[in-house]
Amino acid sequence: MTFYSVRMRASLQGQHISGAETLVSCPTDVPRLTAQFVERAMNHAKGVPDAITTKIESIPESDIQRVPRLLTREYQARDCHDAHGFVQQQLTTVCSAEVAQKAVDLLLTIRNMRGAILLDAHSARRLEPDHNRGIRASNFGDASSISAKPDNKEIGISKNHYHEALILSSKVMSAPGIIAEICISDDPDYTTGYVSLNGVYTRVHTMKRLGSPLGGRVFILDSEKASVATAINHIENTPVLIL
């Protein structure tokens, strides 16, 4: 069986606006999903993009890894301060307090990165080769959508932040050496973020104020378990279906 990677990236004046992707096994799904992704980009809360790029690649089934999705839970924060403190406390279960604080500080201050920050779990040093581009999780999909026709609300026109973030984070956390991920959506009308570690994806409410353009991701790498190149190659290039 041949799979197809369908990807969309949209930008406005060089700044990221929207992105979406999936893996599908049915060729007739490709044009439909491509059109839905483009329509999503054209109706984004961050504005109408001036550039939209779509990319479609065939992938042999033998190249695809299958990994389980993360377990899920939620944390109802009282306010942004409580949410940030909770995320930082969770990170201290897998890295030092210094690294945990650095990760949260970066998440709350970095602007307009196209991808994620890669942070060393021992030195708190940024490891991504290009600090503007960052690390871009790609080549992943939800196995449960392969056998059933995707729902427009789930994968196409309307963005399901929770589902898409869970699938992305499940792929990221399967990478060699990655011990944690934290994220805030850059959508101004979505204030929930998450922290993933120890096999669990925790939705954290009130990570930012409504209307805020704040958003980004930080991946934390245990550089004693895997090299930077190995982790990046898996996150960006290895095709993964989430079970």
UniProtKB/Swiss-Prot annotation:
Its cofactor is Mg(2+). The lineage of its organism: Bacteria, Bacillati, Actinomycetota, Actinomycetes, Mycobacteriales. Homodimer. Pathway: Metabolic intermediate metabolism; pimeloyl-CoA biosynthesis; pimeloyl-CoA from pimelate: step 1/1. The keyword Ligase applies. The keyword Nucleotide-binding applies. This is 6-carboxyhexanoate--CoA ligase. GO terms for biological process: biotin biosynthetic process. The gene is bioW. Its EC number is 6.2.1.14. Keywords: ATP-binding, Biotin biosynthesis, Ligase, Magnesium, Nucleotide-binding. It catalyses: heptanedioate + ATP + CoA = 6-carboxyhexanoyl-CoA + AMP + diphosphate. Catalyzes the transformation of pimelate into pimeloyl-CoA with concomitant hydrolysis of ATP to AMP. InterPro entries: BioW. Belongs to the BioW family. GO terms for molecular function: 6-carboxyhexanoate-CoA ligase activity; ATP binding; magnesium ion binding. It is an enzyme of class 6 (ligase).
